Regions:
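Radical SAM/AdoMet-radical enzyme domain recognition
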Residues: 50-70, 78-173
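N-terminal pre-core extensions flanking Radical SAM catalytic domains
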Residues: 1-44, 61
């Protein structure tokens, strides 16, 4: 009896008719194959075309979705990453933080710098022998990451470094 109503209002506009936020994963590709990673990087789903992504983001805006969060795979391995950032910012969805393990080239750094978005660089070690064990990367990865960190530090990009400690990289040696 308590919840028995004579009339229900289905006409009044509700505050939220769509999700408040959307988590979007442009790809599940990664430059590393970390020993601690739980992501399914073996499955290669069909990626949405950039036109489909544009439609998706614009529909989210029309539905008054408040936030679109980017996750991945590695963001910089998505071929249209710059265009995606332009689109998100244009539609009012500027990401707060982009995370990567890619040793960024000067060209990528220069392009990313214009967006004024914080960058999180994942660095589990700068020792080539350790990164080869922990990340399953080639011997040049550590050298390239070291140079990328210097280049990022010399830029205007706000950044932070994240590290996952394992029994392989748990010392300062």
């Amino acid at each position: 009896e308590e919840f028995k109503f004579e009339e229900l209002d289905f006409k009044t506009t509700r505050m939220f008719l769509a999700p408040i936020s959307i988590v979007f994963m442009p790809n599940n590709n990664c430059i590393t194959d970390c020993i601690y990673c739980y992501a399914d990087t073996k499955t290669k789903p069909t990626q949405m075309s950039f036109d489909q992504i544009k439609t998706f983001v614009r529909e989210a805006k029309e539905l008054k979705v408040r936030d679109v969060m980017i996750t991945g795979g590695d963001f910089f391995m998505y071929r249209n990453w710059s265009e995606l950032l332009h689109l998100l910012i244009e539609e009012g969805y500027a990401p707060d933080l982009i995370s990567t393990k890619v040793p960024l080239s000067p060209k990528i750094i220069e392009t990313f710098e214009q967006f004024n978005i914080r960058l999180q660089i994942s660095v589990d070690s700068l020792s080539s022998s350790i990164t080869q064990k922990v990340l399953h990367v080639n011997e040049n990865y550590s050298r390239n990451m070291r140079q990328a960190l210097k280049d990022i530090n010399a830029s205007s990009i706000r950044f932070q470094v994240a590290t996952v400690l394992t029994n392989i990289n748990d010392s300062i040696k």
